[in-house]
Amino acid sequence: MKMTRKILAIISIIALTFSLTACGGGTKDSKAEGNNESVEDTSTSGSLLKVQIDAEVASMDPQIATDGISFEVLAAVTEGLYSLSDDGSAVEAIADKVEKSEDGLTYTVTLKDTKWSNGTPVTAKDFVFAWRRLVDPATASEYSFIAGIAGIKNADAIVNGEMTPDQLGITAKDDKTLVIELDTPVPFFESLMAFPSFFPVNEEFYNKCGDKFATTVDTILCNGAFKVTSYEPAATTINLEKNADYWDADKVKLSGIQYQVIKDSQQTMLSYQNGDLDVATLSGEQVEQFQADPEFKNIMSGYLWYIASNKKVAGLDNENLRKAISLSYDKEAIVNNILKDGSIKADFLVPTLLATGPDGKDFRDGTDTYLSTDKAKALEYYDKAKTELGKDSFEYTMLIDDAESAQNVAQFIQAEIQTNLPGMKINIETLPKKNRLERLRADDFELGLTRWGPDYADPMTYLDMWITGSPNNYGAWSNTEYDSLIQSAKKGELALDSEKRWEALKKAEKMVMDDAVICPVYQQGNAVMIKKNVSGIEFHSVGINRVYKNTTKN
């Protein structure tokens, strides 16, 4: 049944009215703008920065978000106890003064005088509510595990349903004082506090919004350098403006940020050359054309791309078949001929330049490599698998993002596997990133080309995800010896001896790779174009990839 545009418009206005009545006040002068509208830069205090992203923001809820793009936008509009400086070290943000006990188990934090974008003060209770919500099984946060990584008292037990959220080691002594208790000292605790999962949420505002929280501009509350002026799920344009009430507003020179979702590389560069973008990511085909341009930048990230395999699927539960797949595609060709963006081949789980050990050396220094391309060896594993499984042919579907680079890499891997492992057919299913992640988390897949970025500068950020039951353990691998080793390195005997812990982490990586839990592909580099009148963008390989607080555009 069809309705006229006029009737549809009236219905939309009525629905919007009810939405604003139920949960208003995202900003004091918030605007209900369409998701494709651009924002005219009328401010005299700075300029609008226009940034290309290659996927939609999946969530603006700090306790629900899981992907790098969502984290980047969240960090622009929300701030926690700490933030990252330009050199990647943790510095106080909402925290004004931090006292740490001698045993490293108690942090007493005095908060700055700050407020939300609706004028409400940011209080210690906002952190208590947010952190309890993070670990509450009812929230079903994919990042609930990170509270345990941070060592917060009782976090793991609450996540496992053995204790209640109000038993979490965080209390509000008063509106300005927060007391945090840990189970064990965590050397990277401060840097973890800059991660979006630990951002505050105002309980009263959250309760008014209900299940609409963080889904529209009027259901998002901001306390960061910028505030949201237009957003809705699957929006292709997201607009932010400078938050005049931000505690450090004097240092914010931009009038706002406009994120534009553009997945096609040719359209991206056309927009960049036309002046519609200030920051753009290049595809591999474009690197040679623009790498001599003074606006070209090459930046290494901590992201590891790999193929996840579902161990519940017949055949993929066979170690030899997984090894055959992993060794069958040419990683050097992927990074040198397809990506061309500074990415490096991955024969590992824990990336290079992530963390240094007690000896001052990078984790990869002196550490073995695994699952390197070897097409002859791949055939040997394939023959063993066929004998063990009693089959001569296999067919699997690989889930991938709809971003152009992911499609190019996937098509190359598809051709390599089908050529080098005769009788194996690989189909490709392309989905928006959000849907692809949902399928992976639900174990509703066979193979999936995916990535993981480091949340903090320690190998555990790549190792903890493979414990039994982890929401990020795509494909449901389980190994009780591995689980015990990781638990001891986190909070047991090994956690108290840095050298033994480091060796345990190397052993853990070896266990994952020897079992071919993943098929590693590459560590991501980024080839970007940045207009010459833009400076001060902070790039981080850990946590938030790009920070724009100190960016200027002349």
Regions found by a protein language model. Give the residues of each.
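Gly/Pro-rich hinge or "lid" segments in bacterial periplasmic/extracellular proteins
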Residues: 176, 182-252, 256, 266
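N-terminal lobe/hinge region of extracytoplasmic solute-binding protein
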Residues: 52-102, 221
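Ligand-site clamp/hinge motif
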Residues: 244-288
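Surface-exposed binding/hinge segments that line
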Residues: 126, 142-204
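Long beta-strand-rich cores associated with HINT superfamily self-processing modules
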Residues: 528-554
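Ligand/substrate-recognition segments at binding pockets and active sites
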Residues: 233-235, 379-454, 526
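Extracytoplasmic/peripheral linker and loop segments enriched in polar/acidic and small residues
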Residues: 370-372, 423-436, 464-531, 554
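Structural transition elements
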Residues: 345-384, 405-407
